[in-house]
Amino acid sequence: MEYPTESPKPKITRKTVIFPIIGLAAFFLYIYIFQVDMLSIIAKAQTADPVLYALAVAFSLIEVFFFSVSWRVLAKFLMIKMSVMKSYLLVWYSVFVDTLVPAESVSGEALRVYMITREQGKETCGRAVASLVTHRILGMVMNVVVLILGMVLFFTGTQIDPLIFNLVLLLSIGITVTLLLLILFSFKEKWSLKVINWVVRAGNFLSRGRWHRKLIKIKEDAINIAKSFHDSMKEFKNNPQPLVFSLFYLAVMWGFSLSVPYLVFLSLGQQVSWSVILITATIVLAVKSIPIGIFEVGIPEITMTALYTVLLEPTLGPEAAAGISITATILTRLITLWLRFGIGFAAQQWLELKTVIAPADNVPVEKA
């Protein structure tokens, strides 16, 4: 069996175009409903300090770097060969796919699994999945920690809105439950085998036996991948050192991530509490991490603007809070969405170009 040399490049379809348009329309509808003066928003954005804003851009690039290094630590422990630069480019590629393809919280990860498997052979698939699942688990741990830290800081400074408190509490419980289920499933190999058997039986039933041979081959491959995945998770359990290093890099990443909106507010001449940044960032990220559909254009802007407005209203007043919140949100998303989308596209083109010009003997081939 020969592995394909072309990756499943994300194609521009009707859905990939219409979803961002709907999201942007929803955001501007939100602005219209609350009668926000867009001219004053634009005028305020033009006064942003270019040095501080450029620093926010640099911090965003460094944030992605530490995210990729954090994942690479886990992949390297599982004997997946990958340079620091390669992991950085793969993460940028996944950012591009995450933005373009619905269910963004898993599409980029699936892309990274495919790229590793394509280049290093099918036997690395289970290990690649294990590295990404473990990285997601560590990321969820950091989400809960930062969310709680934001609440503590906010409580020490002012009285928090009951709606925000209930939302933070609900998300903390939801993330924790999901985290525990994910950890439990990662170490229950029998559960994975039962799911595989159920899917194969369902496929046989729906196809009335026409896909029997193909399903048997798929079942064999899936079982091998599942065993490799669970063996890799056991390796992490027996040697937690890479988990510690990965978590450390994630903590550094969070520092740069939170600094981006903070610097954007500073560039607009507005000092804000770190608790406002922590709570808003973790709520947006927590909702984005749920693989239920699109959450990349429109909805994050609405969420960020609403949270900033509610959290800043006690100190700035409703009108000023709304104005600065929308301006900061737009400038932040120019960095964390559109700039990253462009860089991700460049990374995708570079990686695919390297694949095309690579010698044929570098392509892994498995004899049937």
PLM features: residue spans?
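Transmembrane helix-bundle signature of multi-pass secondary active exporters and lipid flippases
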Residues: 281-293, 332-336
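Membrane-embedded helical hairpins/re-entrant loop segments and their flanking transmembrane helices
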Residues: 68-93, 264-280, 304
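Transmembrane helix-loop-helix hairpins in multi-pass inner-membrane proteins
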Residues: 1-43, 97-211, 297-368
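Short, membrane-interfacial amphipathic segments enriched in basic
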Residues: 121, 205-229
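Transmembrane helical segments that form the transport core of multi-pass membrane transport proteins
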Residues: 227, 232-283, 291
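Membrane-interface helix starts
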Residues: 14-18, 47-55, 234-248
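Alpha-helical segments in transporter systems
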Residues: 10, 55-63, 135, 241-253
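Transmembrane helix boundary and interhelical junction motifs in multipass membrane proteins
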Residues: 65-71, 103-112, 260, 275, ...
